[in-house]
Amino acid sequence: METLCHRLNVCQEKILDCYELDSDKLVDQINYWTLLRYEAAMFYAARERNLRTINHQVVPATTVSKQKACQAIEMHMALQSLNKSDYNMEPWTMRETCYELWCVAPKQCFKKGGITVTVIFDGNKDNAMDYTSWKFIYIYDNDKWVKTNGNVDYTGIYYTVNSKKEYYVQFKDEAKIYGAQQWEVYMYGTVITCPEYVSSTCSDALSTTTTVEQLSNTPTTNPLTTCVGAKEAQTQQRKRQRLTEPDSSTISPLSVDNTNNQIHCGSGSTNTGGHQSATQTAFIVHLKGDTNCLKCFRYRFTKHKGLYKNVSSTWHWTSNTKTGIVTIVFDSAHQRETFIKTIKVPPSVTLSLGIMTL
């Protein structure tokens, strides 16, 4: 028992060291996933011996430990294979090699440089969806890794391998989901109409200025091509609008388009997580993720007590006992931005902004 406790302590300390190192070397990411394999294996072995806690940590259920072990093995093997390719000397951050990004479409491949693609259905700005195109996609094809570029056209979002387009988002299928007869695709505020429907769609297209200011969350310095989707042959009677999102933002490892591991918040941004009312309010951050990971992360950032006002213990909603939550309270929006820029958030932890009435 003492040996297991010691090994788990050493393993988790090294995992936290990987977070603080913030390396962009592939060998360091392989080491990180090796440690996660060891941690999951130790939790699994402890549960098999009917141990409920280790070092005051709750031992996950056998199925949970097994699932995490399988994920770690999958990522470890994929990264080891990538390390033997021509791309092993490229920068590889923890964010770019996390399991969540590995599972995002296109699945089971590595991706870099996310670009937001906004699709407006039926010309209604309230019935819009955001998708992600990738600047670089690394595909394992014919026993080797191939680097290709992501692209967008009026049909969907795709990449090209062996001169063949592989679509991982089809706008025609998405239009059926949202009850649309036609769609418009915007990227960086630029719109290009489908050649077959120039006359019927150009008059209804939104202006580029409106798109840049209201729809695009990405810089407009690199104009990329986008397009307007064609009308569907059959008119669907039912139309579903996406509800307008509240004035709060959620930052997660997968939603950041940068390729580094730092979360950026512009000082001039008006999205501060909500509007202050006449009552006393406080700016907050919710950290969501695995309970054990949150406890370790909370312990590490307590040495930066000047960057926040107060922090809660780990809690969870009664309907979801697997996901833990830590709430951090700030005196001002500026203090919150400083905290986000200073503290490195693990890729398995989701960061959400908001306000709370006191």
Curated annotation (Swiss-Prot):
Signal peptide location: none
Ranges annotated as biased composition (Polar residues): 246-255
Annotated spans, DNA-binding domain: 281-358
Main location: host cell
Pfam family for this entry, one: PPV_E2_C
Transactivation domain as annotated region, ranges: 1-199
Region (Disordered): 224-255
GO cellular component, one term: host cell nucleus
Record location of the Glycyl lysine isopeptide (Lys-Gly) (interchain with G-Cter in SUMO) cross-link: 288
Keywords: Activator, DNA replication, DNA-binding, Early protein, Host nucleus, Isopeptide bond, Phosphoprotein, Repressor, Transcription, Transcription regulation, Ubl conjugation
Subcellular location: Host nucleus
Entry's Gene Ontology molecular function annotations: DNA binding; DNA-binding transcription factor activity; nucleotide binding
GO biological process terms on file: DNA replication; DNA-templated transcription; regulation of DNA replication; viral DNA genome replication
PTM field: Phosphorylated. Sumoylation plays a regulatory role in E2 transcriptional activity.
Protein's job: Plays a role in the initiation of viral DNA replication. A dimer of E2 interacts with a dimer of E1 in order to improve specificity of E1 DNA binding activity. Once the complex recognizes and binds DNA at specific sites, the E2 dimer is removed from DNA. E2 also regulates viral transcription through binding to the E2RE response element (5'-ACCNNNNNNGGT-3') present in multiple copies in the regulatory regions of the viral genome. Activates or represses transcription depending on E2RE's position with regards to proximal promoter elements including the TATA-box.
Protein family per UniProt: Belongs to the papillomaviridae E2 protein family.
Subunit text: Binds DNA as homodimer. Interacts with protein E1; this interaction greatly increases E1 DNA-binding activity. Interacts with protein L1; this interaction enhances E2-dependent replication and transcription activation. Interacts with protein L2; this interaction inhibits E2 transcriptional activity but not DNA replication function E2. Interacts with protein E7; this interaction inhibits E7 oncogenic activity. Interacts with host TAF1; this interaction modulates E2-dependent transcriptional regulation. Interacts with host BRD4; this interaction mediates E2 transcriptional activation function.
The protein's name: Regulatory protein E2
Organism per entry: Human papillomavirus 51
